[in-house]
Regions:
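Fungal intrinsically disordered, low-complexity polar regions
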Residues: 1-62, 259
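Helix-loop junctions that connect tandem helical modules in alpha-solenoid scaffolds
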Residues: 4, 15-17, 56-66, 103-112, ...
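Alpha-helical solenoid cores of large eukaryotic proteins
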Residues: 3-9, 21, 57, 76, ...
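HEAT-repeat alpha-solenoid elements in large eukaryotic scaffold proteins
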Residues: 20-34, 63-90, 98-101, 108-124, ...
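Core helices of alpha-solenoid repeat scaffolds
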Residues: 32, 44-58, 89-104, 123, ...
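Alpha-helix boundary/capping and short turn/kink residues
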Residues: 113, 131-135, 154, 190, ...
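Hydrophobic residues within the alpha-helices of tandem HEAT/HEAT-like
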Residues: 77-82, 104, 118-130, 141-149, ...
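Conserved tryptophan-centered aromatic signature that marks the ligand-binding surface of SH3
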Residues: 235-241
């Protein structure tokens, strides 16, 4: 059932920004700025019913017949995550989202800009609201989203960038996240390398009070290699972005920064 609720700003968490063209900015802003009325549920069964009704829409490839139901499903999920389900029925809600994850990623990778954007915004919202609750989805999410960042469509790449940033900022840090950033720093496409500097800065700021989590297991060496690699990147934008990340690194580990 639907009940009105105060508007909550879920889009203020980016620790860095990359300039976009006006089309990309306006397309994303149109969806970010809309008011989404939350769905409030009264039982686990309601969540089950919502998820079960969506599953058929995500089967197979995107077609002229299923893209609109997929878009409506994303609208429903964005309403659901803003309601009481993530708090009152957390475990059941997250199990339901996990069962829909393949379909959600199909939406994220859609060539239809508004559909893909809706998928990315949902992932940003669930990362900010559920945080560590989506830890078991992070590997699959980062694999897909970093690949999205390498695509030719600038709007989709920018959405992927913002979504990766939101995930890194809100989930539990594990060394595998740093591995993904290292791979992005070496990507043959310039956009993941450009974005990786911002993602790394977000990660460093997040873990600044828990430095040992990065220091253990060789993580600090990986960070240094990422910084050195991008500071020597042939693309000036990548070099410039990583300079800001270096100064963040230098504040946290001044002895290593001076080397």
């Amino acid at each position: 059932m639907l009940r009105p609720a105060p508007k909550v700003d879920l889009h203020s968490g980016l620790s860095h920004s990359i300039s976009t063209d006006s089309l990309a900015a306006s397309a994303t802003a149109a969806l970010e700025g809309e008011y989404i009325e939350p769905i409030f549920v009264d039982s686990n069964r309601e969540i089950d019913d919502i998820v079960r009704n969506m599953l058929p829409h995500f089967e197979g490839r995107e077609t002229e017949h299923n893209w609109i139901p997929r878009e409506k499903s994303m609208e429903t999920l964005r309403k659901l995550v803003r309601g009481n389900a993530p708090q009152a029925y957390s475990q059941h809600f997250l199990v339901g989202i996990k069962s829909l994850l393949d379909g959600i990623l199909k939406v994220v990778n859609s060539l239809r800009t508004t559909l893909s954007t809706a998928g990315c915004l949902f992932l940003q919202e669930i990362a900010k609201i559920c945080g560590p609750g989506i830890d078991n989805m992070v590997e699959m999410l980062l694999q897909n989203l970093i690949k999205l960042c390498a695509g030719m469509k600038k709007i989709s790449a920018q959405n992927g960038n913002a979504t990766v940033d939101a995930i890194i900022q809100n989930v539990t840090y594990v060394p595998r996240i740093l591995q993904h950033l290292s791979f992005a720093c070496q990507d043959k496409n310039v956009q993941p390398r450009l974005f990786a500097a911002g993602w790394l800065k977000t990660l460093l700021n997040k873990q600044a009070r828990h430095k040992s989590s990065i220091e253990h297991g060789g993580g600090l060496d990986i960070v240094e290699k990422c910084i050195k690699r991008c500071l020597g990147d042939p693309n000036p934008g990548v070099r410039e972005s990583m300079r800001g990340t270096f100064w963040t690194f230098n504040q946290i580990w001044p002895d290593r920064g001076e080397e």
